[in-house]
Swiss-Prot record:
Homodimer. InterPro entries: MecA_C_sf, Neg-reg_MecA. This is Adapter protein MecA. The N-terminal domain probably binds unfolded/aggregated proteins; the C-terminal domain interacts with ClpC. Belongs to the MecA family. It comes from Leuconostoc mesenteroides subsp. mesenteroides (strain ATCC 8293 / DSM 20343 / BCRC 11652 / CCM 1803 / JCM 6124 / NCDO 523 / NBRC 100496 / NCIMB 8023 / NCTC 12954 / NRRL B-1118 / 37Y). Enables the recognition and targeting of unfolded and aggregated proteins to the ClpC protease or to other proteins involved in proteolysis.
Length: 235
């Protein structure tokens, strides 16, 4: 296990499969058990925080980025001057697999999309990248938040959905998993979207928890390409 101090508020920990084996756990078992994942996070924190910078009363955020060699864990301390968006920017900068165009588009979408209190599917207009003449093209996106009973359902959805340019985040909130899906309407017909969502709902349900609640209070497990990463690891 290796650690790297990104800044005063964020630690990056590289854990390979042999480290996980020594701890008697696999990536699959870790992501499939919310009690294990929380215990694992804080055990790692206690090992790497040798200078005791992360006090017990600090609010701490974790993000896990699985790969075929193990995983990367980002541990971030939250305070008024260190907002969640800044922490996610730090993580993105260290994620070599994260396409830049997905990051840029998704950040804009997250600023403009809002989920209704009833957990409805939401549409919102978002500007695409600028044209050469300086004009912008607006297109609509569909946001859906799905509640999952367990991690195996996330694997089933990852292996079932066939939507191009899909942005997907996996959250852990109050012991349950949630998928935040952002679908560019220009890349899928309404009929296809309806059919794909029907497949997803075989393994989940539409969530009444809003994206704002997940963003502020949930644990972001996989960012932007959650379904792609899950499929590559567990298909």
């Amino acid at each position: 296990m290796e650690k790297e101090r990104i800044n005063e508020n964020t630690i990056r920990v590289m854990i390979d499969n042999s480290d996980l084996k020594d701890r008697g756990i696999t990536v699959m078992e870790l992501l499939g058990n919310h009690e294990k994942i929380e215990s694992f996070f804080y055990n790692i924190l206690s090992e790497v925080d040798t200078e005791h910078d992360f006090e017990d009363d600090d609010q701490v955020s974790f993000q896990i980025l699985p790969n075929r060699n193990g995983l990367e864990l980002f541990i971030s301390r939250l305070d008024e001057e260190n907002k969640i968006s800044d922490i996610l920017d730090n993580i993105t900068n260290f994620s070599s697999k994260q396409p830049a165009n997905i990051d840029n588009i998704s950040d804009k979408r997250r600023q403009e999309l809002r989920q209704s209190d009833k957990g409805d599917i939401v549409k919102s207009k978002v500007s695409s990248s600028d044209h050469k003449d300086g004009s912008q093209e607006n297109f609509e996106n569909t946001q859906v938040i799905l509640a999952l009973s367990d991690f195996e359902n996330a694997i089933a959805i990852a292996n079932s959905l066939k939507i191009e340019n899909l942005v997907s985040d996996l959250y852990l909130y109050e012991g349950a998993y949630y998928l935040n899906l952002l679908v560019p309407d220009h890349s899928v017909s309404q009929e296809q979207l309806k059919n794909e969502l029907a497949i997803a709902l075989e393994f989940s349900r539409i969530s009444h928890v809003t994206h704002e609640v997940l963003h502020e209070h949930g644990q972001l497990i996989l960012k932007h390409e959650a379904l792609e990463k899950i499929k590559s690891l567990f298909s």
